[in-house]
Curated annotation (Swiss-Prot):
This is ORF2p protein. Facilitates virus release from intestinal cells in vitro, possibly through the host autophagic pathway. It is a single-pass membrane protein. Coiled coil: none annotated. The keyword Transmembrane helix applies. Residues 13-18 are annotated as: Important for viral replication in intestinal cells. It comes from the Viruses. It comes from Coxsackievirus B3 (strain Nancy).
């Protein structure tokens, strides 16, 4: 059985928040999660959401520059 702790090293790979949901929902649906595991999931989602938001803002600024 895969645990949340085993997923943590791969959190960089989980990436985009949509992918976060695709991976996390099966865990939430089928495995009783401890408080530690829920907090770990929240941390991974927060980390990756912030990372993608920053990339999106940079991309938007690049499109707004006069060409």
């Amino acid at each position: 059985m895969v645990t949340i702790e085993r997923l943590l090293p791969y959190s960089y790979w989980i990436g985009h928040p949509v992918t976060n949901r695709a991976i996390i929902y099966p865990f939430v649906g089928f495995i009783p999660l401890s408080l530690k595991e829920v907090k770990t999931l929240q941390f991974i989602v927060k980390l990756n959401t912030a990372k993608w938001e920053l990339k999106y803002q940079r991309k938007r600024l690049g499109h707004m520059r006069p060409g």
